[in-house]
Regions:
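Substrate-binding/catalytic cleft of secreted carbohydrate-active enzymes
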Residues: 3, 7-170
Length: 170
């Protein structure tokens, strides 16, 4: 059975994950990031279709997001959390992933997903972006569906930009 659920993401999106580590690990940015996440969660807390809170997009990981995740879990412990950029760390300290419920990736191959699941992956696996729906981009879904259906620790995925961006003419 397929269904449509929403992963709600705040507007913290830097498109340069590895280069944003100084922001993600800088306590001076905690309030700025927390403010965006707080506004998103409070705005959409009563929307039943929202099943996952996302901390943002491609913006590295550090103390700023650890604090934001702690706030989200204290405010709404019922919904799941994910942050794909949690993998982008500087390796200089031990990171806290305790408030992340899901391990998420963008556009992984089937073999990459299998490697995580068959290895020491300790969180359910979800594709936070896949099947980019631009032009004739959305393809190969059947292979992903078969993989999801055959592995209990996968949660499916979220189609990125669920619409074509072609120009509409009358």
């Amino acid at each position: 059975q397929r269904q449509m659920c929403i992963r709600d993401s705040n507007n913290w999106d830097n498109k340069a994950a590895r280069w944003n580590e100084p922001i993600a690990n800088n306590p001076e940015f905690c309030e700025s990031i927390l403010d965006r996440i707080r506004r998103c969660v409070i705005r959409d807390k009563n929307r039943a279709s929202v099943v996952i809170w996302s901390m943002g997009n491609e913006s590295a990981y550090g103390v700023t997001f650890e604090e934001a995740l702690a706030w989200v879990k204290s405010y709404d412990s019922y919904r799941l959390t994910h942050y794909e950029s949690a993998q982008y760390t500087d390796g200089k300290r031990k990171y806290d992933y305790s408030n992340l419920d899901l391990y998420s990736r963008m556009y992984p191959s089937i073999s990459e997903m299998a490697e995580y699941i068959d290895g020491d992956g300790d969180k359910p696996y979800i594709l936070c972006e896949y099947c980019h729906a631009m032009g004739n981009g959305p393809g190969d879904l059947e292979d992903y569906f078969q993989f999801f259906d055959s592995h209990e620790t996968t949660c499916g995925g979220f189609v990125w930009e669920w619409c074509d961006h072609a120009i509409y003419t009358v």
